[in-house]
Curated annotation (Swiss-Prot):
HAMAP family: Formimidoylglutam (MF_00737). One of its GO terms (biological process) is putrescine biosynthetic process from arginine, via agmatine. Its EC number is 3.5.3.8. Catalyzes the conversion of N-formimidoyl-L-glutamate to L-glutamate and formamide. Binds 2 manganese ions per subunit. Mn(2+) 1 binds at residues 128, 153, 157, 240. This is Formimidoylglutamase. It comes from the Bacteria. Keywords: Histidine metabolism, Hydrolase, Manganese, Metal-binding.
Length: 309
């Protein structure tokens, strides 16, 4: 179920009502109906929320991520506008279908429209089943292109299941599309079963463990990212917030006790964000029910701010 953006979410400190150099994003955000918005030339950044945690529930995780998109909006709205980049809020999609895949399909239809309007599209979850919806949107928008999927995540999310969950997205992509590849950074060895590592070997999944990038990113790993991007026509980028150490991101569905720092994630992201092949970015698993001082939502908002500016 699609709902347009809620203007009440966009509030914050006002330093000036006339001097644009003192504006914050809540003062410049544009609220749009995605079904009625069509632009002549791609511009700015679009935001579409995936207010869904049914996939987390089906994956036996702790629910609450459906509140993630609005928590991120509230945090992002009070951040400063540093460059003249328009940002459009298209609202949220909610789960009201019998099956999760139907909600993912609905989200994909709307996200694909957004891709046509903006240089970058920012998709905010919600559970990491947003990644399969993101992929479906990419395939709708680019039916004949090779898609490179880059995921910063503690988990492979290649579980085998009878239906979509927050832990199946990338298996669904790989087994349904010979023209898509998967590269994941931040894998926690103790949090993925041997069968998942075996599946990665079988499918030729490229991955980098958290231990390899815990303190710095070597030139070899930077080269791996660059080579992966160069091999594909378009890039889909997704971040699961459970890859972040719980000291920085306690409000997630599956917190990490030895995760990555925000600085490492931003450095990894800089290899990807800004590349002309990048089409969409998603950030998943922000769970306000377990957050502390809105720390996780603020971190996602900071990521978005860095990606835009």
């Amino acid at each position: 179920m699609y709902k347009q953006a809620n203007p009440d979410l966009w509030q914050g400190r006002i330093d000036s009502e006339t001097d644009e150099s003192q504006f914050r994003h809540f003062q410049t955000i544009e609220l749009k109906d995605i079904n009625e918005t069509k632009v002549d030339k791609k511009a700015g950044t679009g935001i579409l929320g995936y207010a869904v945690d049914k996939g987390v529930e089906l994956n036996n995780g702790r629910v609450g991520a459906q509140e993630g998109p609005d928590a991120v909006r509230k945090a992002f709205g009070n951040l400063s506008v540093l460059t003249p980049c328009p940002v459009y809020d298209y609202g949220n999609v909610y789960h009201d279908h019998d099956h999760l895949i139907d909600t993912q399909e609905e989200y994909a239809e709307l996200a694909a429209k957004m891709f046509q309007n903006h240089n970058y599209s920012f998709l905010v979850g919600g559970g990491h089943d947003i990644a399969y919806a993101q992929y479906l949107a990419m395939r709708k928008a680019y039916p004949d292109s090779s898609i490179g999927v880059i995921n910063i995540d503690a988990h492979f999310d290649t579980r085998k299941a009878d239906s979509s969950t927050s832990g199946t997205s990338f298996r669904q992509i790989l087994e349904g599309d010979d023209n898509a590849d998967y590269f994941v950074l931040g894998i926690q060895s103790a949090s993925n079963t041997k069968s998942l590592f075996d599946y990665a070997e079988e499918r030729g999944i490229e991955y980098v463990t958290a231990d390899e990038i815990l303190h710095e990113i070597s030139p070899t790993i930077k080269d791996k990212i660059d080579h992966f991007i160069n091999r594909h026509d378009v890039i889909m980028f997704t971040i699961c917030m459970d890859v972040v150490d719980s000291a920085f991101a306690p409000g997630v569905s599956a917190p990490a006790v030895n995760g990555l720092t925000p600085h490492i994630i931003l450095e990894l992201s800089r290899r990807i964000v800004g590349h002309p092949k990048l089409v969409s970015i998603s950030v998943a698993e922000t769970n306000p029910l377990y957050d502390m001082d809105n720390r996780t939502a603020k971190l996602v908002a900071l990521f978005l701010h860095n990606f835009i500016h």
